[in-house]
Amino acid sequence: MREKYLFTAVGRLTRTRDQRGIECPMIILGGKEYLLDLQELLLWSCLNWRIVKKEEINALYDKLSNGSGYVPSRTLDACINRMITRGLIVSGSGETEYDALYDLLSSMYIIPICDKPLLQFLTVARLVLMNRVKISIARKILRRDQKSADEKRVMDLARQALLSTAEIIRCIEMDVTSLPDSDSIMEAIYNDRETTSDNIGDLVKAAPCTKEVLVAVANLYQRKQLIFDRV
């Protein structure tokens, strides 16, 4: 059986200035800074908040770069390989798409994007009062980020500590809801002689809650509720 592959982008996009004062795109990943050229920026942007198959990357890249007039010096495949080597694009593989998704996400560290419901409500209310947005549309905006029970559990844990998907699976498997300090993390996740940060992904793959957590993480990511990081 031919292996399945899935890809996504990791890190947080920001901007900096070079020695000439020119603004440049940059990815923050694992506390390190990575400058991007235009082709790398286009490719990273195609995959950010998406989980895609290899054959889908070309179409996404062509759609984003169409009309830019930019002619890169390398092929798209060469750029993909370079970004994978730099760690800015990650891939997962497996016999099934579920296996590939687990391989992709299990080692990813989850960083929730700060959501401010009160600020969102006040902004939408202001637009309604100014007749910029209809009430029916406002209701849809405010409903957009409603989360399932599994998604809420993932976000609650991720807000307390920097955890990988596999570590969140272990927490939910052990019914852990509070992680006030590093000692509680070690006690909840690495409280036996067998579990390490290197093998936890393999150990929790068959846990009863794994599928639900994996789907929750993937859905939250594709709804732009979180980003992935590496340590």
Annotated model-derived regions:
Residues 2-6:
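A structured, charge-rich N-terminal accessory region that forms the first stable segment of a protein
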Residues 34-231:
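Long, charge-rich, low-complexity alpha-helical segments
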Residues 7-49:
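N-terminal ordered "arm"
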